Amino acid sequence: MNTTKMSEESTMTQPVKLLYTAKAHTTGGREGGAARTSDGRLDVKFSVPGTPGTGTNPEQLFAVGWSGCFLSAIKLVASKMKVRLPADPAIDAEVDLCNGDDGYSLRARLNVSLPGVDRQVAQSILDGAHQTCPYSKATRGNIDVAINLV
């Protein structure tokens, strides 16, 4: 197996306690490729958005991953704030693939619904979740992000 060492300038920080490592094998990329997780729970085919292909694409997977993680962060923050969440909190995630002068990039919107929660309290929960969620941390300062309370 070939590995690429990161330069000293871009070394990864070591986690205090490793909780989980996701493993996936991908071939072919978005143009007819496929991916499968090591445990087999996710097994997908890729296709380019806007083509007749029936596969998913990296942007859809990113939207699903981030919204699922962010919803867990919302639940954690609400619990710490001792706020009871509704039974049906939801996130509609939108991830755009863009192409500009600097090449390809992403931008994202997480449209969060917390029915029945006071608007100021809900906004505090979202702010805390955005500071807690690993996806939010990974994208902070790297892509345009909007977290909207709807």
Set out the residue ranges of the language-model regions.
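Extended beta-strand/beta-hairpin segments
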Residues: 2-64, 71-150
